[in-house]
Amino acid sequence: MLYNLLLPHIHNSHIANLFHYITFRGGLAIIITLSLSFITGPILIEFLRSLQKNGQPIRSDGPESHQTKVGTPTMGGIMIILSSCLSTLLLADLTNKYIWITLFGFISFGIIGFMDDYAKVTKDNHYGVRGKSKLLLQGIISFIICVLLEYLDKSPSHLLNVPFFKNLSLDLGYCYIVFAIFVIVGSSNAVNLTDGLDGLATVPIAFTAGSFALISYLVGNLIYSNYLQLTYIPNTGELTVLCAGLVGSCLGFLWFNAQPAEVFMGDTGSLSLGGVLGIISVITKHEIVLAIVGGLFVIETASVILQVYYFKATKGKRIFKMAPLHHHFEKHGWAESKVVIRFWIISVIFALIGLSSLKLR
């Protein structure tokens, strides 16, 4: 909004001219979302605590240390969604189609997560909305997003770019839509599975969002994209502002989510954040890079899939003491803080590997 209001005055005002730069607006988005989180966090947490008598239900079969979390309110993802959306509406170009499509997906996945959290809190169990129902809703929203991208792009690309290789891409044709839906839904649920310990998912999400802030900027810049031999996609640079807002809102949320957590982001936060990262990767044509940068989410998801498959195949045997993987290490006696920090380190490594693909070809 501010960008659109100040745009006519960029040649007459130094301040207005600053808003012409995506990097300036991205930095400002981080400051705004951090500030909003610090200001609204205590108010929202107290409000959620007053509404949720018992807080988020804690699994009885989980690590014993988790019983100390009883009574902690959930739905803290509302803080992340509100601050990110507000900063984006203030600082991004509101004539940009990618901004509106991404915000639509972000909020829609947040609503699904809210429904799930609400069901858990009201029923006082950790099951929530049926898994198939959530997948169906996620699939419908992802399909709508893919159709919008197809319709609004004059010449939509169905190419899947392979990182670390020059000029290597796969033309998926209209199967790309199915693939894109898989990426968005998969990303949403992968982040959801990772969000099992205080602060565990928040920092890797910030790393991933920060990585895609850079990717969006480069892909949307003709000079940089040509230099790095990336697929140039006009107008994607504005997503840098949104990604920067995600970084700031996640760091602001971490202030309250660090162990011992005062609030959980819940499915409201994890499903929406995973979904929006998937959407941005599809728009920027860096779907495989998302799997690399967000490698921690992939590993956590793979551990659940392997556990379930092996359990069914062997009629009761398990590969891990408990899935997702972070619970396995807790069952091995690792302190929660040690698991979280070590997983953060792994996330940094994956982010660096993913970003190196922009240059190493």
Curated annotation (Swiss-Prot):
GO cellular component: plasma membrane
Bilayer disposition of the protein: Multi-pass membrane protein
Annotated keywords: Cell cycle, Cell division, Cell inner membrane, Cell membrane, Cell shape, Cell wall biogenesis/degradation, Magnesium, Membrane, Metal-binding, Peptidoglycan synthesis, Transferase, Transmembrane, Transmembrane helix
Cited PROSITE patterns: MRAY_1, MRAY_2
This protein's name: Phospho-N-acetylmuramoyl-pentapeptide-transferase
CDD domains recorded: GT_MraY
A Pfam family reported for this protein in Swiss-Prot or TrEMBL: Glycos_transf_4
HAMAP family found in the cross-reference section: MraY
One GO MF term: UDP-N-acetylmuramoyl-L-alanyl-D-glutamyl-meso-2,6-diaminopimelyl-D-alanyl-D-alanine:undecaprenyl-phosphate transferase activity
Principal subcellular localisation of the protein: membrane
Transmembrane segments: 28-48, 74-94, 99-119, 133-153, 168-188, 203-223, 236-256, 263-283, 288-308, 338-358
